[in-house]
Amino acid sequence: MSPAPRAYDVSLPTHAVGVLEWGPADGPLVVALHGFPDTAQTWRRVAPLLADAGWRVAAPYLRGYAPSGIPTDGGCSVRALVADARALHGLLGGDGRAVLLGHDWGAITTNAVAGDPASPYARHVALSVPPFPAMNPSPRTLGTWAGAMVRQPLHSWYIAFNQVPGLAERDFHRLAARLWRQWSPGYDATEDLAHLRDAVPDREHARTVVSYYRALLGPGITPALAEPVHPLLLLHGDRDRCLEPGLARLAGATTVGGAGHFVQLEQPEKVAASVLSFLS
């Protein structure tokens, strides 16, 4: 059984941040960002493997996911998430070796930070969502892109669903369970959904969490449109039913066999091995 993580809080100007941490206190830092609808516990299988290699893995709960607070500024845009990731580098004791690792919304944030020339992180790893610009077609890839885009709307219905005020938060946990089943077919998410119920205990938290999608229509999306300028590893499950694997391959992602969207939980050894190889 993997060792239990250390749990503690740090403070940002807009909210408190709950953090789970694995590994040696003096190890180089990996800040690991979870996605939607998920929690920092999503790293419980990969983090111990990175910790065994000497890394200190700190996994914050994102805005609106308890024990982190609901931000006083109400911000849930990519720009706000990038600001949090940059601030956490210093708050968590990062240095010039620090790595930013993200899944889903954590990957969107990681990709945006990798597009910032002033990123405080030396390397960046994104799981299950490549940079948005990297998924644009070229004349050479137009056919593959078109085939993937025909299928993608079948997976992306939830984005429009989350735009409707009051709808997604009314029965958030039923929506979450459906998405886990759809995105990672065959994976047993019982433990993950239990963690999610603790992290999203009421309608106010649910409203904050789905507001990430509502903020996509505002100016705060801009950082996510930047091309990466720092070293960036992309990993994507071959059975992902959230974002078409074909789009990820066009972006240069390495395919992880036997995994859906929650690749870090379904194939932790493969993910950890790829990350450690990239970091070496």
Predicted regions and their residues:
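Flexible "cap/lid" subdomain of the alpha/beta-hydrolase fold that forms the substrate-access gate
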Residues: 2-6, 14-17, 41-42, 58, ...
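Short hydrophobic "strand-cap" motifs at the C-terminus of beta-strands
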Residues: 33, 235, 256-259
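Alpha/beta-hydrolase fold catalytic core
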Residues: 1-29, 52-55, 280
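Residues that form or immediately flank small-molecule/cofactor binding pockets and catalytic motifs
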Residues: 24, 239, 258
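Catalytic histidine-centered segment of alpha/beta-hydrolase-like enzymes
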Residues: 259-268, 272
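Conserved HGGG/HGGXW glycine-rich cap/lid loop of the alpha/beta-hydrolase fold
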Residues: 20-69
